[in-house]
Amino acid sequence: MLKVLRGALCVALLGAVSGMFHAGAQDGTRTIEIHAKRFSFSPAEITLKKGEAVTLVLTSDDVPHSLVIDGLGVKGDMIKGQMTKVNVTPSKDGDFQGKCGRFCGGGHGSMRFTVHVTDN
């Protein structure tokens, strides 16, 4: 009887955890994964629509970094082995430049990221 209860509990927990990871897709929010490594972002540019809610999922593939996009109010730490979620809904169109906000070595200044926001 105890084995049956443990099995049922495991199935229930897996279902609950699975539901948490799919919540972003169910509410209509687009998710974009962005990785950082010395000395680049991948992808290096993305395109968003004005007024579109987007979740950026940030992670580092090596040392600590951060993504800063001043024109969109984005700032998120990027730590190896961790995911940082940053929500953004652009209110104006145009091109916005991002950069690494945490010194990560000699090529730090070359870490650039571009967000294109379209009106349609």
Specify the residue positions occupied by each region the protein language model found:
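C-terminal segment of classical bacterial N-terminal signal peptides
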Residues: 15-23
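Bacterial N-terminal signal peptides that target proteins for export
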Residues: 1-10
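A mature extracytoplasmic/lumenal domain signature
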Residues: 36-38, 52, 60-62, 71-73, ...
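Short structured motifs
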Residues: 40-42, 71-73, 83-85
